[in-house]
Amino acid sequence: MQYTLKQISEHLNAKVINEPSGEVIITGLNYAEQAKENDLTLIDKQEHIKLWQNSKAAAAIVSKKISKELAQVNDKPLIVVNNADLAMAKILELFSVPYPEQNGIHEKAVIDPTAKIGKNVSIGPGAYIGKNVEIGDNTIIYANVCIYNDAKVGTNCIIWPSVTIRDRTIIDHFCRLYSNCSIGSDGFGYRPSEDGRTIVRIPHIGNVVIGSFVDIGSNTCINNAKYGSTIIGDYTKIDNLVQIGHNVIIGKGCMICGQAGISGSVTIGDGVIIAGNAGIKDHTNIGSDARIGGKAGVMWDVPAGESHMGYPAYKDSELAKQWIAIRKLPETMKKLKAIAKSLNIDL
């Protein structure tokens, strides 16, 4: 797979500076420090300029704000764009390896006769499609996927091997579910018995509702609602190994990073980012455009637009004061002991 520099710049509708007289062939994409002679790289930050100086890459996609400075480093061609990261995403699509070819319904797929299968749907070997399931047009279902009774999957979805979609789940259009994720398992609902000697299981009779253009990473679990629905909004992206409890409501355009845990009945607004390994206490509310730092432990509501981090999580500006105070604590104790000694007081 290869493209000329001209084809790439035209695909981005972008200007080239240090444009060469001859044709430049691009055969791959890589980081500046790892790039080979026919690779295209990305330079989008001031601190990456030094990497470009020593890079073997044939050309770079660069942010407009640093393009003039970068053009003086050497005479290699630069494709200038407003947002280099988003531009590179478009080029990554050009170089993406096609999905494994799968046409039609495999003879070893098990499909209940009551299921409704749309046009141009592909279903791989070992897949199970239960009673009254609906699959939209152009959806690809790979090997060993299980979709249980009364579930609905929209159009143009891609469901990778060994995904489990439980009863009554509703998934809208253009979603991607990666291998081994589990959608609609019972929530962790248990209560001590009246005598306190055993644990009583609470049935979960609701469902999971997933909007359009949602990505769900490998080994992520989204639990069924006790009643009502666990809801994931349009365009939300969920990493691998994320746990989402029963009756959680997540808004549109959120990003949830790996190993985050969201307890039952949490409500999350639109555009929220939750970093890796963060934990959210049950029945809390996270406002739209909030940011939750890595390994944060959120114990109470987070207002819209605020950044919270640490354990327990506080607003970033408040937590910074705590960190400064802790760093000063040894010196403060030293001074306090000196004062106590001068006053003949034991600490």
UniProtKB/Swiss-Prot annotation:
Molecular-function GO term, any one: N-acyltransferase activity
Catalytic activity: a UDP-3-O-[(3R)-3-hydroxyacyl]-alpha-D-glucosamine + a (3R)-hydroxyacyl-[ACP] = a UDP-2-N,3-O-bis[(3R)-3-hydroxyacyl]-alpha-D-glucosamine + holo-[ACP] + H(+)
Active-site residue numbers: 246 (proton acceptor)
One GO location term (cellular component): membrane
EC id: 2.3.1.191
Associated pathway: Bacterial outer membrane biogenesis; LPS lipid A biosynthesis
GO biological process, one term: lipid A biosynthetic process
Key words, A-Z: Acyltransferase, Lipid A biosynthesis, Lipid biosynthesis, Lipid metabolism, Repeat, Transferase
Pfam family, one: LpxD
Entry-linked PANTHER family: UDP-3-O-ACYLGLUCOSAMINE N-ACYLTRANSFERASE, UDP-3-O-ACYLGLUCOSAMINE N-ACYLTRANSFERASE 1, MITOCHONDRIAL-RELATED
Purpose of the protein: Catalyzes the N-acylation of UDP-3-O-acylglucosamine using 3-hydroxyacyl-ACP as the acyl donor. Is involved in the biosynthesis of lipid A, a phosphorylated glycolipid that anchors the lipopolysaccharide to the outer membrane of the cell.
Family under the similarity heading: Belongs to the transferase hexapeptide repeat family. LpxD subfamily.
Alphabetized NCBIfam families for the sequence: lipid_A_lpxD (TIGR01853), PRK00892.1 (NF002060)
Self-association state and partner proteins as the record states: Homotrimer.
Protein name: UDP-3-O-acylglucosamine N-acyltransferase 1
